[in-house]
Amino acid sequence: MLRLSLLRSTATLPVKCQRRGLILPAAAMYTLGSLIFGKEARLADAMERGELHNKNVDYAKEAEERTELRIRALANTRPMEPRYNGHVPLHRYEKLLLFAISGWNSFFHPEDGYNIVQLGEATALPVFLENLKQTMLSDSSGRRILKEQPNITTEILHMDKLAKLPHNTLGYVYYQWLKRENVSPDTRAPVKFIDDPMHAYIFKRYRQCHDFYHAITNMPIIIEGEITIKALEGANLGVPMAILGGILAPLRLKKVQRKRLYNIYLPWAVRTGLSCKPLINVYWEEMLEKDVTALRKELKITLPPDLRTMRKERAALRKEIDAKYNSQKRATTPA
């Protein structure tokens, strides 16, 4: 019996050792996991209670200081310190790149206003802006505009009041034009890449007055209308981007659109721009209650043929021709 018990104990010894060999690593893994995940859980709880960080340190202030240091480091790579709110100084090679990229994008994607905005500033050379400044300084209204530096916004213009003005006033015509075209004076992009603060304001003023040029000439914001107004601005103010737009933009239009522009609207725009008073000197905000016909006469602006009407008549004529063609085709086709 004793020998049998010894044999059984000897036989079960490897099995126990084997089990112990499995249990010990498992216990070690469990202990290690408890330490790791338990520590993470405690850290999470401490973070939630606000006990993790040093309470004597203002981490929000430190983050703000780090951001400020990064901004200063970036500013040190600029050719000059920003000279007005929103100013982004560019090196000469960056201005050339801005001109090349925005010019390319504007030609192939004229519907994207951001491209036009960048091209406008890239081509707004100091000599042009200084000439525009002298034009404003030579006129009493222009001098007041430079001194007061007004902004054209919906808040300043009081759109609700414009809607109630007599229908023959500039303010009502302007309000109706904005409503019909579904645009707002608040959507004009700020100037960023022009270095001189006064030049930057002059270009911003030109940009903000653009919709008044549309409204007083009853020109829609479709591509033909935009090219026409750009040609008007180029002839009247000498805006480089407007001159480029008047020359190059028609090349991408359909034949019938180019024909309308070359035969009617571009000649009108150049003739009117050269003969009318400098539009940059018009204090539009003070003209809102004035009779629009009298104002056109004062500025020497004549209305062009209504572009919307011409397009509708062209579409109706084409529809009529297509209907006649299809009718004749059905009549001559054997059943």
UniProtKB/Swiss-Prot annotation:
It is a peripheral membrane protein. It holds the Pfam family Coq4. Pathway: Cofactor biosynthesis; ubiquinone biosynthesis. It catalyses: 4-hydroxy-3-methoxy-5-(all-trans-hexaprenyl)benzoate + H(+) = 2-methoxy-6-(all-trans-hexaprenyl)phenol + CO2. It is found in: Mitochondrion inner membrane. Its cofactor is Zn(2+). Keywords: Lyase, Membrane, Metal-binding, Mitochondrion, Mitochondrion inner membrane, Transit peptide, Ubiquinone biosynthesis, Zinc. Its main location: mitochondrion. Lyase that catalyzes the C1-decarboxylation of 4-hydroxy-3-methoxy-5-(all-trans-hexaprenyl)benzoic acid into 2-methoxy-6-(all-trans-hexaprenyl)phenol during ubiquinone biosynthesis. PANTHER family: UBIQUINONE BIOSYNTHESIS PROTEIN, UBIQUINONE BIOSYNTHESIS PROTEIN COQ4 HOMOLOG, MITOCHONDRIAL. Component of a multi-subunit COQ enzyme complex, composed of at least COQ3, COQ4, COQ5, COQ6, COQ7 and COQ9. Interacts with COQ3. This is Ubiquinone biosynthesis protein COQ4, mitochondrial. The lineage of its organism: Eukaryota, Fungi, Dikarya, Ascomycota, Saccharomycotina.
